[in-house]
C-alpha cells in the first residue's frame, strides 16, 4: 500500500490566497525605493499564483468542465454556438483567443453578464480579489491577459443546458504546437 500525501484543504487554499494578497500589500511600498524595485517586481509575480489558488478554491463549490485545445481550434466559437451568443458577447479575438481562464456559468439572467475577478486595493489600502462588471469590449480586451491584475473572467448566461449555476465551462488558453 502506498502512502498518499494529504491533500490541501479548501480552508488552506483560501488562507494561502489571503497570505499572497497580504504580501502584495506589504511589498507595494517597495515600488518607490529604486533599490527595492526588483523585490517589488518579483512580488508582483505572485499574481499568477493567486490566480491558480482562486481557481483551485472554485473547485470546492463548482464543477468545472474544461474546454481545452490548440490555439485557433475553435474553443470560443464552440461555446458561442453552444449558448447561441450573438453580437459582442464572448467576442474574443479569433485565432489568438483568451490568455486567461474564462468561465461560462448558467444562472438566472436574461442576457449575458460579464465579470472580471481582479486584484485591486480596497479602502484600507490592502489588496483583495474583487468581482467587477465589464462591458463586452472590456471583457474581450481583458481576455488577452495583458492586465496581470485580472485573475480570471466569468460570463453569466441564461439557463440553457445545465440549469445549474454550480457548473461552469472553463475556456482555457490555447496551447501551441512546438
Where are the language model's segments positioned?
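Inter-motif core of Ras-like GTPase G domains
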Residues: 165-168, 178
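Conserved Switch II/interswitch segment of TRAFAC-class P-loop GTPases
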Residues: 173-177
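Conserved glycine(s) of the Walker
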Residues: 74
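N-terminal low-complexity/disordered regulatory or targeting extensions
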Residues: 1-71, 85-166
Amino acid at each position: 500500500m502506498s502512502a498518499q500525501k494529504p491533500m490541501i484543504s479548501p480552508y488552506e487554499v483560501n488562507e494561502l490566497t489571503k497570505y499572497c494578497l497580504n504580501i502584495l500589500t506589504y511589498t507595494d511600498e517597495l515600488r518607490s525605493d529604486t533599490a527595492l524595485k526588483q523585490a517589488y517586481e518579483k512580488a508582483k509575480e505572485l499574481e499568477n499564483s493567486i490566480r491558480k489558488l482562486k481557481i483551485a478554491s472554485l473547485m470546492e463549490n463548482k464543477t468545472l468542465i474544461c474546454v481545452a485545445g490548440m490555439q485557433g481550434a475553435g474553443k470560443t466559437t464552440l461555446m458561442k454556438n453552444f449558448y447561441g451568443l450573438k453580437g459582442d458577447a464572448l467576442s474574443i479575438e479569433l485565432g489568438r483567443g483568451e490568455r486567461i481562464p474564462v468561465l461560462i456559468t448558467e444562472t438566472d439572467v436574461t442576457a449575458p453578464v460579464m465579470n472580471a475577478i481582479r486584484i485591486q486595493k480596497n479602502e484600507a489600502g490592502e489588496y483583495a480579489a474583487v468581482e467587477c462588471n465589464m462591458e463586452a469590449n472590456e471583457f474581450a480586451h481583458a481576455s488577452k491577459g495583458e492586465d496581470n491584475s485580472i485573475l480570471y473572467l466569468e460570463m453569466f448566461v441564461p439557463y440553457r443546458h445545465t440549469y445549474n449555476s454550480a457548473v461552469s465551462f472553463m475556456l482555457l488558453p490555447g496551447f501551441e504546437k512546438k
